[in-house]
Amino acid sequence: MEFENLNKVQKMYAFSDQEMSNYLEIDRATLYRWKEAGEIPESYDSKVNALIAFKEGVRDSGFSLEGKVDYVKVTFKTQDYIDVIAKVLCLQNKPFLEEEKGGSGYDTKYTFQNINLFISKKREDMGCMIELKGQACRQYEWYFENEQKSSWRDFFIRCFEYERTISQGEGKFMNIPRLDIALDEKYNEDGNFELGKLVDLWNRGLVESRLTMKQIEDNGQYGKAKTIYFGSRQSAYHFCFYQKDIEQAKKLGLDIDLIHSSLKFKNRYEVRMCDDVALDFVRKSLNERIDMARLAVWVINSKIKVFERMNGDKVLNREWYSLLGEVDRIGFSTSPVETGFFDKQYRWLNENVSGVTALIKKWENITGDNKLKKILFDGEISDKNWKKLE
């Protein structure tokens, strides 16, 4: 048998040479000899064929994953935030408004919709930081598609290009302090992967990883909502797996069956990276033209191996790799959302004021009072809010 057949399977499941050798019960020197010869001895055909058959078997599963950028922070060693808005974000014609409070150690924030940019007026060495978190990513994607005709790939290319324009001497003039890639497992009427099984497999010694595993359970109306962490949240990378359907049902106040039928959410698998790990991830994606969803799956598979027992043998877990094994079924997507300038204010009014206003109006119809109208029309607009209207 040609070694290339084994090589394809090894790459697909992100096995290191040592892990592949252990799985085949050979030493690494033997694996290297096979690689150099380009062939595998006939006596190992059955084991390798079982791996290849496993690969083909998971290809046709009903599981599917959809990946997206869900959180990104990019810093530059410059305080010229206007230049960063124009040349990196390409949002130079948008009204970024200054806010007195900053965040992440910065004292000043400029914000447009949910898109944030920070600087420190007291510490020039901090430069500036772009922050796109959750909804901000979806809003920015709207400008990708409707105004810029660009993509996340283009955005990160602009980041590296901008670093070159501001570089002065040695050192790093750009960093990615945070990058989260979210992999959403869509709801499947025929069944989905149950996160509790991963905990059970871990307890039975059938999950191999150098990372620590921690499970958090939250009791609620939908039962125990599970969140599983691999690795420390203080480290350069960690994984967070959780039940997205339950999270959204709580957040939106909707029935979980509606979340399944309309939004198609089930589980989410997040790869969270910081600093050099995030930089290397983006560089690999750009240089090798690998979409970030597939690369995120490769990262998970390189750090976590999941097995099961079959006829006494320890073999790859078919259900897990049906979800995270066949990368050809994994797509990178955008979910652009157009947001009006005062949408946050309208949402706040709807959630916090509309009910009370309706109650007061009913009361005033009974009593004949007219205080509500006076309150609504006598309100003053602050200087900060006048700027939003300019």
Question: Language model features by range: what are they?
Answer:
Residues E4-L6, Y23-I26, A50-I52:
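Secretory-pathway ectodomains
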Residues L6, D17, T339, Y346:
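Helix-turn-helix DNA-binding elements, focusing on the entry/boundary residues of the two helices
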Residues E19-N22, F342:
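Short alpha-helical "recognition helix" segments of helix-turn-helix
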